[in-house]
Regions:
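Small-residue-enriched hydrophobic alpha-helices in membranes
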Residues: 1-80, 90-191
Length: 191
């Protein structure tokens, strides 16, 4: 539970920095480390609220997240998280697809494109996990050129990972690998 408290604290700090950025009108705020969370802190709030915060942060950047690199990296990230435990049940695949097409930011893209890219990555991961993972991480790494997009890809993965109310160690590991591919310290997201 301490990890969720730390992530929640970081999300609040990040959200506050986004509010400050919006107030300045520059549109080019810092997306650096949002640390400050304390392991073991108990400032209330639930996992659902944390996921809601990530969704809000993504929605606030919706107009900046329209590139093909973000779209492709997000779908690779969603697939990597879904298959992190080495399997993707049909119900899980459907649930993640529903999350993808209902996500406010991802609605910048045609739903069929999103489903196709997500399912393509899932199929590759299930056929040969190591090769599929390497391919997914290559696609994710392409978003590293734009730090705001790179962080949004990680947040998208965290929304998917936390959607079922738990954040499994295999999902945390997948997020850490994606952070490494994006040149973002995993500690920035508490993983």
């Amino acid at each position: 539970m301490a990890m969720w408290d730390k992530i929640k604290d970081q999300a609040k700090t990040f959200q506050q920095s986004q509010g400050t950025r919006g107030a300045s009108g520059s549109g080019q705020g810092s997306h650096g480390p949002v640390g400050g969370g304390r392991p073991g802190s108990s400032s209330g709030g639930s996992k659902a609220q944390l996921i809601g915060m990530f969704k809000s942060q993504l929605a606030s950047a919706k107009n900046e997240l329209k590139s093909g690199a973000y779209r492709d990296a997000s779908m690779a990230m969603c697939a990597l998280v879904a298959a992190a435990d080495g399997r993707v049940e049909p119900a899980e695949r459907q649930r993640v697809e529903e999350l993808i097409v209902s996500n406010e930011v991802l609605q910048n893209f045609p739903a069929d494109q999103l489903r196709q890219r997500f399912n393509q990555h899932v199929d590759r991961l299930l056929a040969n996990y190591e090769q599929g993972k390497a391919e997914a991480l290559q696609v994710i790494a392409k978003a590293a050129k734009k730090p705001a997009e790179a962080r949004a890809v990680v947040q998208t993965g965290m929304v998917v990972a936390g959607a079922d109310g738990s954040f499994e160690p295999s999902e945390q590991y997948a997020i850490r690998e994606a952070c490494t591919a994006l040149n973002i310290p995993p500690s920035e997201f508490g993983v």
